[in-house]
A protein has these predicted regions:
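N-terminal active-site segment of His-dependent metallophosphoesterases
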Residues: 2-105, 110
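Binuclear metal-dependent phosphoesterase catalytic core
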Residues: 4-32, 157, 250, 258-288, ...
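Loop/turn elements at helix/coil->beta-strand transitions in domains of secreted/extracellular proteins
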Residues: 20-24, 41-44, 82-85, 118-123, ...
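Extended active-site neighborhood of metal-dependent phosphoesterases/phosphodiesterases
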Residues: 27-37, 97-234, 250, 254-264, ...
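Active-site-proximal beta-strand elements of phosphoester/diester hydrolases
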Residues: 42-57, 165-179, 235-245, 307, ...
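Generic enzyme active-site microenvironment
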Residues: 48, 89, 126-127, 238, ...
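Surface-exposed beta-strand-to-loop junctions
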Residues: 49, 85-92, 165-173, 275-278
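Active-site environment of divalent metal-dependent phosphoester hydrolases
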Residues: 53-55, 94-96, 127-136, 176-179, ...
Length: 388
């Protein structure tokens, strides 16, 4: 029987593998990794998005390779950043709108398995468009069946909670993209109720009437009542779809962001018959990837958020709206969308200061190449043992 050329070689290979796995799973964060110890009273949240898990539909490659690697990435990221809670900003499922209730539960169990020993951390999950579907398939019953398995969400897919004296609010932003449906009206009612709640908690202490349309026409009516809340005195707002980002054109008119000519939306929220080119195509692209301008204005006016966290754009951005409200868009934490996966770490200080670090993970081809090289070296070492 062939022997190893050196008794130390297997140990060297194992040590090299462990060092490689530790390197690939360590996130690279802007400004360096957040300090492991927080000041008294501070809160740190790990913001992830667009995991796009398949649950019971996962392939063997997903179950025995991607889930294993993703679990290592989560474990190392949590050990490095030491968050107090985890927030998923939508699209935890790749095709949740096609799932029945048992398949939806399988997705949640898959995520729990990926978190492993850290599945006991406080967790809040926001619903995204891949979870509930586009406007043509948005169904209140489906949203209710999903939301009842997600602590903190009501039947419309919205939620409000407090953690470490910090108020959070999550909205079913997908419903706000779709006019004329009951789910949208329910989300608007949640907005009015929470706005009333935060006004009552405000420094003025006056009992204000709920915000919203005087005639019940909803967000689009633009007839909200005066809000006495100061900027940033509202909750930390959690969304999947980002807010509309206006910018000045050459004529000085506020309009939608412009994209290169020929941009065509292939987003599931947009029907294929509506895919256009040129200016109309660019507007359609923006409308399918951000909330409408009127909904954005209403949310900012009604809630006066402390800060907004959103996703869906697959990339990181830190944007300040014209009224001074800060919105941070979190990158996708999956290889399925291409590019480099990542997440954000938000640290909430007691004096109202929020610091955000964007952390990036390795691309999938690094992992595939690394494991391939390790297998090649192992095979070469075994082959070498036969030659000696």
């Amino acid at each position: 029987m062939a022997a190893w050329p050196s008794p130390w070689l297997p140990l060297v290979l194992v040590a090299a593998l462990l060092a490689f796995e530790d390197w690939l799973s360590t996130p690279s964060c802007s400004g360096g990794s957040p300090a492991p110890d927080l000041a008294a009273g501070d809160l740190r949240a790990m913001m992830v998005a667009d995991l796009m898990l398949l649950g019971s539909d996962a392939t063997y490659a997903d179950r025995f390779f991607r889930d294993h690697v993703t679990s290592k990435l989560f474990t190392k990221s949590i050990e490095t950043t030491n968050p107090d809670m985890i927030i998923v900003l939508g699209d935890i499922s790749a095709r949740g709108s096609e799932h029945n209730e048992s398949k939806w539960i399988a997705v949640l169990e898959q995520f729990e398995g990926i978190l492993g020993q850290y599945s006991s951390l406080p967790l809040h999950i926001v619903l995204g468009d891949k979870d509930v579907g586009g406007c043509s398939s948005l169904d209140g019953k489906l949203v209710h069946h999903m939301a009842k398995h997600l602590p903190g969400l009501d039947s419309s897919g919205c939620g409000a909670f407090e953690f470490s004296n910090i108020s959070f609010m999550s909205l079913n932003a997908v419903a706000l993209l779709c006019g004329g449906n009951t789910l949208r009206f329910n989300v608007e009612k949640v907005l009015e109720r929470e706005s009333h709640h935060f006004q009552k908690k405000g420094l003025n202490g006056a009992d204000h009437s709920p915000l919203g349309s005087e005639n019940g026409e909803g967000v689009g009516a633009h007839s909200w009542r005066q809000n006495s809340m100061t900027l940033g005195s509202g909750p930390v707002l959690l969304l999947h779809i980002p807010l509309h980002k206006s910018q000045k054109s050459d004529t000085g008119v506020i309009g939608v962001p412009m994209f290169p000519d020929g941009t065509v939306s292939d987003h599931p929220l947009v029907p294929p018959s509506s895919k256009l080119r040129g200016v109309d195509g660019r507007r359609l692209y923006d409308q399918s990837h951000t909330l409408p301008a009127n909904s954005t204005q209403y949310i900012l006016q009604a809630l006066k958020p402390r800060i907004i966290f959103s996703a869906h754009a697959d990339s990181f951005s830190d944007h300040t709206h014209p009224d001074g409200t800060r919105e941070v868009t979190v990158p996708a934490m999956t290889w399925k969308k291409g590019g480099m996966p990542g997440f954000a770490i938000a640290t909430f200080g007691q004096k109202g200061v929020v610091s955000v670090n964007c952390c990036w993970l390795v691309q999938e081809w690094y992992i595939m190449t690394g494991y391939s090289v390790f297998l090649f070296l192992t095979a070469l070492a075994i082959r070498w043992s036969h030659w000696i």
